[in-house]
Each structure stands twice: as structure tokens, then as C-alpha cells.
């Protein structure tokens, strides 16, 4: 295979195979592809529209070149990493729901990064709340064993991504790189929730997760444009269970929500995002707390801890309102 020939196929609006995508991205991860060729590759793929095989191939290359954990974890893992990029400016729902899930006994390996399109990425908000996000590999693995929660800072675990950094920054628009990050948790969790920035990606992502062999996974996009479960509008999601894919919708009205304030979910700055996150963790019954409970409830559903998302929401809501999640997080950061 020759990288230029692969790019030419994409320019001609032809799909490339899993093998071709993996070959090209593997060369990128080794610093063997010029920035001009890489820019052409991701731009042509974006213009054509990324296929399942292309995203899968690029994901396999990123996983192959990531750091590998030295620990064999004796339990099932969940990740709540999403694509971001929905442009909505909501609080860090997936991060706060990950903390809530960990407080309920779910082992969470949260894979994330600094802000890309929002005011605060998962790394940013955790740091603002007092959590050490840039720990060593040994510390990250030890935290999961001892605390049931850990954070994998993507740049540390994917050092080969440095070869793509300047191209991504210069282009400034979403490419296949925005897709493969959430699919490339180095701890290879068996369970995963991914929120995506476009509705059609729920189908693409669940098929990639199916190939990757996850036990159970869920990919969602809400009808008001969020890459998470919405408390305001119906959320459409695909579910992978026992290697079978199914399609569903969740209407938050089934939870009896009324008079929820959007300003309690949306942040206009990193400082505002921190204020809202602290209000959620401090058990205030605001809209943001409902949003976190709903998404944590979906996590309990994916893990098989409950039979429905509604049941999961009620358990997560109680953990947040009772102070259980707050106490867990306080214990977590007191050990930093």
C-alpha cells in the first residue's frame, strides 16, 4: 500500500478499507506521513463522509500505538467518554456522571482531554474541582484499583498523536480524529457510553464498538443536538448487547420533569461550568443535577445494574441528593 494512493481514493469519493485506513493512520502515528498528506487524508475523508471501515481502521491504529496498562484489572470497566463538538456549551455531564457512577460502585476508567469546543473539557473541570488529571501511568492504574475511578489524560496515553497535532489545530474543523479518541480508551473497557455530535453517528459508532467486541455499549444523540441524554428533548440511541444492535428513543417526560431551567445546564465560561459542577456535587436539585443523574442512570443501565434508564436515573438522583456522590468525590480528591 502507498499513502498517496489511499488519499487519491478518498479524493475520488471512494471508501477505503479497514486495512488501508489502519495502514495510513499507523504511518501517521510513527511520524512517517507529511502534514500536507495527512491534511489531505482527513479533509478528503470528511468531505466524502467517514465510513464504518475507515473509522474502525483509524481506531485500530490509534489503539495499537497507545501506551498499554501494566495492570490486569479483575473487574469490568465503564467509560463515559464522548465526542464533544456539539457546540452546545453544556456543563461536563459525562464527567460528573462518571463520578456519580463510581460513587455507586461502578469501576470507571474515564478517558478524556482538555477542552476542544466547549469551555471546559473533562480534564479541565476535574482539575478545577481538585482532581489530579496528569498523574503517572502507575498512579492512574493504582487509582482504579484503590478508588474505583481513574482518569486517563489522552495526550499522555496517546503520545503518537503529537504527529497530528499541528494539522488538527490548523484545520480547525472536525475530522476522523474527533471520532477515534472516544473509541480508543487504552484500558479497553468492556462497557461504554458515547455521546456523539451528529445523529447519524449513533449507527456508525455502535458498529465500530460491535467490531471491537464490547460486552454492552450505548451511543446517543439528543434531538436538541446534545452529545448526551437530554432532559429537555427525546434522545435517540443505539444499543449493543450480546453482539446484537438495536435502536431506541428515550423521552425525558417519562421522568416527570417540569419547569427545568436551561441556564442551570448551560455554561458560558469555564468559571461558570465549575460553579454549576459544584452545585451538582453539593446536592442542589437544579436542572444540571437532573442531567447528570439521567446520564449516570444510562450508565447503570449499560452496566446491567438496572433494567431501565428510568430506574437508573432514580438511583443516581438519590446518590446525588443524599450527598453520597459528594462524599465519594471529597474522599477521592483528599487522597491526591
Swiss-Prot record:
Its cofactor is Mg(2+). Keywords: Amino-acid biosynthesis, Aromatic amino acid biosynthesis, Glycosyltransferase, Magnesium, Metal-binding, Transferase, Tryptophan biosynthesis. Binds 2 magnesium ions per monomer. The keyword Metal-binding applies. Pathway: Amino-acid biosynthesis; L-tryptophan biosynthesis; L-tryptophan from chorismate: step 2/5. It catalyses: N-(5-phospho-beta-D-ribosyl)anthranilate + diphosphate = 5-phospho-alpha-D-ribose 1-diphosphate + anthranilate. Anthranilate 2 binds at residue 168. Mg(2+) 1 binds at residues 94, 228. Anthranilate 1 binds at residues 82, 113. Catalyzes the transfer of the phosphoribosyl group of 5-phosphorylribose-1-pyrophosphate (PRPP) to anthranilate to yield N-(5'-phosphoribosyl)-anthranilate (PRA). Belongs to the anthranilate phosphoribosyltransferase family. This is Anthranilate phosphoribosyltransferase.
Amino acid at each position: 500500500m502507498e499513502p498517496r494512493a489511499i488519499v487519491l481514493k478518498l479524493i475520488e469519493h471512494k471508501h477505503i478499507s479497514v486495512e488501508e485506513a489502519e495502514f495510513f493512520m499507523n504511518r501517521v502515528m510513527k511520524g512517517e506521513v507529511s502534514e500536507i498528506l495527512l491534511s489531505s487524508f482527513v479533509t478528503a475523508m470528511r468531505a466524502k463522509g467517514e465510513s464504518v471501515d475507515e473509522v474502525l481502521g483509524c481506531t485500530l491504529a490509534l489503539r495499537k500505538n497507545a501506551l498499554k496498562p501494566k495492570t490486569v484489572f479483575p473487574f469490568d470497566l465503564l467509560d463515559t467518554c464522548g465526542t464533544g463538538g456539539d457546540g452546545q456549551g453544556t456543563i461536563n455531564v459525562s464527567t460528573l456522571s462518571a463520578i456519580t457512577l463510581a460513587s455507586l460502585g461502578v469501576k470507571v476508567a474515564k478517558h478524556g482531554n482538555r477542552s476542544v469546543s466547549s469551555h471546559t473539557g473533562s480534564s479541565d473541570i476535574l482539575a478545577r474541582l481538585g482532581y489530579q488529571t496528569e498523574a503517572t501511568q502507575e498512579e492512574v492504574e493504582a487509582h482504579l484499583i484503590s478508588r474505583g475511578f481513574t482518569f486517563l489524560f489522552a495526550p499522555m496515553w496517546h503520545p503518537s498523536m503529537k504527529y497530528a497535532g499541528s494539522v488538527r489545530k490548523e484545520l480547525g474543523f472536525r475530522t476522523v480524529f474527533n471520532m477515534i479518541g472516544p473509541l480508543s480508551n487504552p484500558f479497553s473497557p468492556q462497557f461504554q457510553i458515547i455521546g456523539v455530535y451528529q445523529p447519524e453517528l449513533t449507527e456508525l459508532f455502535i458498529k465500530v464498538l460491535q467490531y471491537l467486541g464490547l460486552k454492552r455499549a450505548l451511543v446517543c444523540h439528543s434531538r436538541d443536538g446534545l452529545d448526551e441524554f437530554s432532559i429537555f428533548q427525546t434522545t435517540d440511541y443505539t444499543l449493543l448487547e450480546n453482539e446484537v444492535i438495536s435502536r431506541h428513543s428515550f423521552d425525558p417526560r417519562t421522568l416527570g420533569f417540569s419547569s427545568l431551567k436551561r441556564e442551570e445546564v448551560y455554561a458560558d465560561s469555564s468559571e461558570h461550568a465549575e460553579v454549576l459542577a459544584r452545585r451538582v456535587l453539593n446536592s442542589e436539585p437544579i436542572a444540571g443535577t437532573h442531567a447528570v443523574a439521567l446520564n449516570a442512570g444510562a450508565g447503570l443501565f449499560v452496566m446491567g445494574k438496572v433494567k431501565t434508564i428510568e430506574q437508573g436515573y432514580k438511583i443516581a438522583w438519590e446518590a446525588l441528593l443524599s450527598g453520597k456522590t459528594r462524599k465519594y468525590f471529597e474522599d477521592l480528591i483528599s487522597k491526591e
